[in-house]
């Protein structure tokens, strides 16, 4: 039993030492940030965990899997990336807007900003929320953008 523990310990230590050399790249330092807009106005979105996703692709490497970027409730998104050209697309049927998978080409270098223009089914404006005697009340205007929505 002692011999098995010793062999297992040496094997584990060897694997640990070998694994240190596998990740020899510096971490990415460039920052991509953007917003999702309609007619120049930033959209508010449903903020569930992983709700609205964008996908980044970088050509020229063996791994062609997308880098998933999540949008926040205020319609912004961000990612820390390596410098280089990326393709940004919305995930298929993943947002409250007309499904459009146009590719946005983004050259990431340092601090980079971009805008994803979409056509939402509806917009909400003039939100007014009040609290009176532990009763929450709210009003807003809803505009239908897509007529067959």
Give the role of each language-model region:
Residues 67-72:
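Short beta-strand segments within Ig-like beta-sandwich modules, predominantly Fibronectin type-III
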